[in-house]
């Protein structure tokens, strides 16, 4: 079972999704023109390793990739990792820890998450509290602490959508750090672009912002160096290649919630992870047989909807701070 831990550091932070001691099948799709990533080549379907042990999302721009080192070292102390010589032979285990970062250096003081911060976020993910309902914490937390979304403060958000496949229903949950260069609000109407997806996912109605009040908010991004990153988790037994397709399709949610999206100065990156009884398989076991095409279509649609709603969740629950406007504090449309 995937668990989540955050290290919130005032003006930046780290979020870790821990996939269990045997890991989980995963892949990634990178769409932004300025990504900051680690171990993404490994997750391409044609490469060897099938499973990851954790995924790290971090602030601090490229400096924040150091947080993954702390996660790796912490897991190594628990003898968790890819068995280099196989499960049945003694030898080193290498934790597989992909990561992606956002540019948040314009918020607060220049502060970089460290390996120690990554380890702290992992320890939080390993705690009993991390296995509570995973959609409860959102907004200004973890990797979303220093995020901005257009003219508003961004953050960390989550949303879950059911994929109604022909033979089985599966859950698809998106955990997103919303820090786009583009806007998340329609300046003419004051509505969040992803409001309908959020309302469908949560059952909660959202008020539109007052367009004049929103227009008066200064854009805090003197340099458009940003990024929306996240992880899509499903309980469907997808293969690594299908996880790649799921990550690719999930980017549609960014394109619907952010305008423009996938710009040359964004580093938009989405990981996809199959959370299917990871403890029942060995870390070097072959992947599952996968799902059929109609099921993949349902999973992809649900992933895009979940990503769209999670971005809105991040923005709606962002806390005031650093002189940034927030959805919660701006006047609403009459």
Model-derived regions, located:
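A structural signal for small-residue-enriched, beta-sheet-centric alpha/beta enzyme cores
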Residues: 2-69, 73, 77-334
